[in-house]
Curated annotation (Swiss-Prot):
It comes from Brucella abortus (strain 2308). Pfam families: CxxCxxCC. Belongs to the UPF0260 family. This is UPF0260 protein BAB1_1496. HAMAP family: UPF0260. The lineage of its organism: Bacteria, Pseudomonadati, Pseudomonadota, Alphaproteobacteria, Hyphomicrobiales. InterPro entries: Puta_zinc/iron-chelating_dom, UCP006173. It comes from the Bacteria.
Length: 152
């Protein structure tokens, strides 16, 4: 009998810190700025990345200190995964919370951190600007995209 991987046997609250961190697929989509319509609460995606995102690796340049540098950085926890409605449908945290399995390209499944990029899921090659390039809020409108433009 083969043991099932941890993401198939545990819920998010049961994960160790190491398991939690490994669940991130490294796509970088959570590091893109989203706009929210004040009237409808609809979420709009942009191709503007957080200043800390490395657009090639799709990893944070200063992960341990990100909240100090970027105070409004979302610190995902098991408690808020269900509340964050802009998480991509491909997000492993969302998938596990919903009781779904990970996709073939997830590094925990494929064994390679490159498959998330090869599958076109990551933001590699899709970042058009960084938040420090934006002069005012209206500048973000020039970089609005549909989520399918981010993940193939």
């Amino acid at each position: 009998m083969t043991d099932k991987p941890f993401w198939q046997t545990k819920n998010l609250n049961q994960l160790t810190r190491s398991e939690w961190e490994s669940l991130c697929d490294g796509c970088g989509q959570c590091c893109l700025h989203k706009l929210q319509d004040e009237d409808t609460d609809e979420i709009y995606w942009t191709s503007v990345a957080c200043t800390l995102l490395n657009p090639e690796t799709c990893q944070c340049r200063d992960y341990p200190n990100r909240k100090k540098t970027v105070p409004d950085c979302i610190f995902l926890t098991p408690e808020i995964v269900d509340e964050v409605d802009w998480l991509p449908v491909t997000c492993a945290y969302r998938l596990v919370a919903e009781g779904s399995d990970l996709y073939w390209w997830h590094p925990l499944v494929s064994g390679s951190p490159e498959t998330v990029h090869e599958a076109g899921i990551s933001v590699r090659g899709k970042v058009t600007a960084f938040d420090h390039d934006m002069q005012d809020d209206d500048d973000y409108l020039d970089h609005m995209v549909t989520p399918d433009k981010i993940a193939r």
